[in-house]
């Protein structure tokens, strides 16, 4: 049985991750750390889910460090937008800074497996700001030296976001139509949020058990086809 800590539990992918964790019998306990109370918390058994809610993100690392028992898996689906942060510079400070700070706190606490929801275009050498930020987050958490690091790189994430992203919404609409015609028309470039979530949980549990593909013992990167494989319903 695994104990899991999760940040980003109120986002599109993170909310599905929380639901998947709560439904999975291999998960003994889930701790979420967030700015808002996750929607799944109302119906979740208190014996399995503990929530820590604070707008003051400077308190998050200390909360993670204090968890007992220590989470064996730490999952980050945390992210923000340029608009919500008030510009890319602030977005970088929040998204990169908090992800790395929380990963370091998890490592120092003794967490064995780190799971990150990244992006298909993540590349620290990219000339574009967003994929470069995602790539730098990946590089910085890899450098922390977890026993096992799992990185998911989804394409366009299909689903319903709470915040408005008009251009992305149009692409999600196209992905939805394509998926209804044939899943193969969508799966290569877009994945549903619930599929990504199940892939994150399943990959995290496999990594904890050491059941990873050859060559992925320390670092396991899942692209779109891997996400579909590990996130499909049984």
Curated annotation (Swiss-Prot):
It is found in: Mitochondrion outer membrane. GO terms for biological process: import into nucleus. It comes from the Eukaryota. Keywords: Membrane, Mitochondrion, Mitochondrion outer membrane, Transit peptide. Belongs to the FMP52 family. It is a peripheral membrane protein. This is Protein fmp52, mitochondrial. The lineage of its organism: Eukaryota, Fungi, Dikarya, Ascomycota, Pezizomycotina. The keyword Mitochondrion applies. PANTHER family: OXIDOREDUCTASE HTATIP2. It comes from Aspergillus fumigatus (strain ATCC MYA-4609 / CBS 101355 / FGSC A1100 / Af293) (Neosartorya fumigata). GO terms for cellular component: cytoplasm; mitochondrial outer membrane.
């Amino acid at each position: 049985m695994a104990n899991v800590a999760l940040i980003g539990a109120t986002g599109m992918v993170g909310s599905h991750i929380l639901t998947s964790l709560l439904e999975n019998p291999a998960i003994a306990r889930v701790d979420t750390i967030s700015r808002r109370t996750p929607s799944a918390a109302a119906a979740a058994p208190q014996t399995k889910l503990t929530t820590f809610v604070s707008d003051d993100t400077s308190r998050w690392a200390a909360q993670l460090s204090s968890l007992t028992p220590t989470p064996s898996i730490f999952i980050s689906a945390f992210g923000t937008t340029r608009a919500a942060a008030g510009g890319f510079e602030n977005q970088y400070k929040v998204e990169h800074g908090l992800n790395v700070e929380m990963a370091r706190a998890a490592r120092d606490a003794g967490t064995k497996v780190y799971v990150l929801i990244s992006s298909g275009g993540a590349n620290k050498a990219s000339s574009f700001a967003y994929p470069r930020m995602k790539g730098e987050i990946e590089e910085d958490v890899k450098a922390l030296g977890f026993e096992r690091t799992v990185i998911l790189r989804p394409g366009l994430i299909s689903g319903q976001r709470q915040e408005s992203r008009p251009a992305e919404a149009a692409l999600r609409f196209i992905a939805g139509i394509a998926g209804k015609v044939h899943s193969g028309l969508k799966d290569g470039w877009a994945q549903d949020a619930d599929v990504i979530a199940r892939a994150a949980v399943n990959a995290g549990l496999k990594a904890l058990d050491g059941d990873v593909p050859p060559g992925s013992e320390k670092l396991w990167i899942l692209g779109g086809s891997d996400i579909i494989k590990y996130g499909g319903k049984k």
